[in-house]
Amino acid sequence: GRPETRIACRIHDECNGSDVFGSDICTCRPYLTHAIEECILGAQNGGVGLVAYSRKEGRALGEVTKFLVYNARKRQVGGDTADQYFARTECVAGVQDMRFQELMPDVLHWFGITKIDRLVSMSNMKYDAITGSGIAVGERVDLPDYLIPDDARVEIDAKTAAGYFTSGVIPDADELRKAKGRGLTT
């Protein structure tokens, strides 16, 4: 690529439940649509927009395991809370996340990308893999609060408290206990 060309980019990890079927337990679909809008805006302003879709369903644990985790979250004593978000995955799957992001930037290198002006991602694993592969990142774009579904508040609060990038407020331990998802009967 040409160094003067501005690039907006999202590497999106597959989420059939949200991306395809519209589940609101996570922020995947709103983040994907927000990224597409950001990429279109970048292209309309003379730059390039790129969304790469990675087949890493359910943090690379697979769809069945992801749905087992969702079930455990909704059925746990006290309900689905942000302070237990990662613990439920670890309890069901033995790990919090199986994604190996170190090879993910290969698709960017294949396109000749040496810098990303606007990385539409809150994931530090993706950011670290991209910058660690020699691609410079200018600005990180988080998901605006108004796009976060109510039931996904559990996910986003847990992730930002765990260190995911945000330009907003990082919830403390009390707020994590209060962030509660929809129950089984609602």
Model-found features: residue ranges?
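Catalytic domains of riboflavin
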Residues: G1-T186
